[in-house]
Design a protein with these regions (language model features):
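Secondary-structure boundary elements
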Residues: 1-54
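Active-site neighborhood of thiol-dependent amide/isopeptide-bond enzymes
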Residues: 34-91
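Hydrophobic/aromatic-rich core segments of domains that either
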Residues: 66-134
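Short coil/linker segments at helix-helix boundaries
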Residues: 97, 201-228
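Helix-turn-helix repeat elements of alpha-solenoid scaffolds
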Residues: 125-133, 160-174
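Amphipathic alpha-helical repeat scaffolds of TPR domains
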Residues: 134, 138-162, 183-205, 234-248
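Alpha-helical solenoid repeat scaffolds, predominantly canonical TPR units
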Residues: 172-173, 180, 190, 217-224
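Terminal, low-structured helical/coil segments at or just beyond the last alpha-helical repeat
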Residues: 215-250
């Protein structure tokens, strides 16, 4: 009804426009309560469930991961084209600028600030290298298969958050994630930590002796690290981390 009432059906991206309005502004359809960024426990350290899409649905507030994921869920329901995209420690929505409303090829929906954001902002604000963009680590719209694969890495991270260990489960999740989304840094990192845990476990069991198994695990870890470097991934500096945290607070 919102689409028809506002004449949005004449636009190719009318469903996206309606969804964006649904998130950004108060309407009867969202109970006059737009979706906002939850500044309390942004990383979910105190309560990991604050990262969940169900929390967004219940409270109309969430973080940079859960808000775009809910947008994606609703877009799929409406039959709208929308894609998950990553920046360092950040998630946002992209869709094609088919109606030429903006100067760029893609429309970037920043649900944390209620803005349509130009691409250069992400490059500058998150200090993303050209190499990382070329290798499709960041700013690349994910396919649905890649989006699901990324959730496997998130599942592995949630498992670690609950049980405080890396093991065969986190290893299986991330190996399968990388099978369908091979350049996903988060999956590479968690897999690397899972391999480290497997190495420690094996060394304890064999009396801390080097053998074929230890050499195999060490080789896998080295390959992962070299892969991350080749893709252009860089560990987030303290300065960038502090800048992003300050930006969240502001």
């Amino acid at each position: 009804r919102f689409i028809v009432a506002n004449g949005l059906e004449r636009y190719k991206t009318g469903k996206n426009l309606a969804l964006t309005e649904y998130f950004f502004r108060p309407y009867s359809g969202n109970g006059h309560k737009p979706f906002t960024y939850d500044f309390d426990d942004t990383g979910g350290q105190a309560d990991f469930t604050k990262q969940f899409v169900t929390k967004v649905m219940q409270t109309h507030s969430g973080q940079c991961r859960s808000l775009p994921m809910y947008y994606k869920v609703l877009a799929e329901t409406l039959g709208a084209e929308a894609y998950i995209a990553y920046a360092p420690a950040h998630v946002f929505i992209r869709y094609r600028n088919e109606d030429k409303m903006y100067p760029e090829e893609w429309v970037n929906v920043e649900l944390t600030t209620h803005q349509i954001t130009p691409e250069f902002f992400y490059k500058e604000h998150f200090e993303i290298s050209d190499k990382a963009i070329e290798n499709k680590i960041y700013l690349t719209p994910l396919t649905d298969r890649e989006t699901v694969a990324a959730q496997l890495a998130d599942l592995a991270f949630g498992y670690w958050n609950k049980f405080k260990c890396y093991d065969e489960f986190t290893r299986c999740c991330t190996e399968k994630s990388l099978e369908y989304y091979p350049q996903h840094p988060k999956a590479c990192i968690i897999l690397g930590k899972s391999l480290d845990a497997a190495l420690v476990k094996h060394l304890k069991e064999n009396g801390y002796k080097e053998d074929a198994c230890t050499r195999q695990i060490e080789a896998q870890s080295a390959t992962l690290y070299e892969k991350l470097k080749a893709l252009g991934w860089e560990d987030m500096s303290e300065e960038l981390h502090d800048k992003l945290e300050k930006g969240n607070q502001e």
